[in-house]
């Protein structure tokens, strides 16, 4: 028989840097998860993605066991890394802060494809381009 789900926790944690300190510890403690067990597993699974923010969905069962799924980094984080900037524009329609090429957008779209609800890479590229424009980036190509 399948385990009963008690709670689902969604967090965004830097890869390889989950610690019991806030904000991770309190969120997991409230859900009744073994914090050290989760942080050890998460850090081991994301060690190769250092420097990225990794969204994670933690499913907690009634017997206090848990499973977690790591997703691809947010499109905004990937775009900022590709453009080499710290943050997007505060006024995206008037101030453009960076430029990304179609090739960079395609590469990000292919990376994000498993988490997007796009039928093909072209649709995923349009989604990523929209995110780029809303951050004040110019898409060339």
UniProtKB/Swiss-Prot annotation:
This is Large ribosomal subunit protein uL11. The keyword Kinase does not apply. One of its GO terms (biological process) is translation. Forms part of the ribosomal stalk which helps the ribosome interact with GTP-bound translation factors. Transmembrane segments: none annotated. Gene3D superfamilies: Ribosomal protein L11, C-terminal domain, Ribosomal protein L11/L12, N-terminal domain. The keyword GTP-binding does not apply. The lineage of its organism: Bacteria, Bacillati, Bacillota, Bacilli, Lactobacillales. Keywords: Methylation, Ribonucleoprotein, Ribosomal protein, RNA-binding, rRNA-binding. One of its GO terms (molecular function) is structural constituent of ribosome. SUPFAM superfamilies: Ribosomal L11/L12e N-terminal domain, Ribosomal protein L11, C-terminal domain. Part of the ribosomal stalk of the 50S ribosomal subunit. Interacts with L10 and the large rRNA to form the base of the stalk. L10 forms an elongated spine to which L12 dimers bind in a sequential fashion forming a multimeric L10(L12)X complex. It holds the Pfam family Ribosomal_L11. One or more lysine residues are methylated. InterPro entries: Ribosomal_uL11 (IPR000911), Ribosomal_uL11_bac-typ (IPR006519), Ribosomal_uL11_C (IPR020783), Ribosomal_uL11_C_sf (IPR036769), Ribosomal_uL11_CS (IPR020785), Ribosomal_uL11_N (IPR020784), Ribosomal_uL11_N_sf (IPR036796). GO terms for cellular component: cytosolic large ribosomal subunit. Belongs to the universal ribosomal protein uL11 family.
